[in-house]
């Protein structure tokens, strides 16, 4: 994905049961206070979630589009990296629901994201 490359994220696992990607902390991805920007956290989670949804599409589907995305931010990140892990919660004919946990380098939960993806036919 172009955005994922622009952010500098790297995927380490890419299959229908789980998609993982890592994003290193960088000053250009931060708020004025030096915290990793929530938009960067959400962009990583959205990218892994979209990939997971795509891998779980029913036969003869064209793709997905996000109809809802909810993020709970639980802690800030001032250094190191984050890793997003996306897993399917529901894979239906018309909707795919993905849950993504974003953790810091110490395995602390940074954010939990739930995405609902409409299946395009």
Regions from the PLM with identified roles:
Residues 25-26, 30-44:
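A conserved, well-ordered hydrophobic junction motif at loop->secondary-structure transitions
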Residues 39-59:
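Active-site helix/loop of acyl-thioester processing domains in fatty-acid/polyketide metabolism
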Residues 52-83, 88:
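Hydrophobic beta-strand-centered segment that forms part of the acyl-chain substrate-binding groove
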Residues 75-121:
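HotDog/MaoC-like acyl-thioester-processing domains
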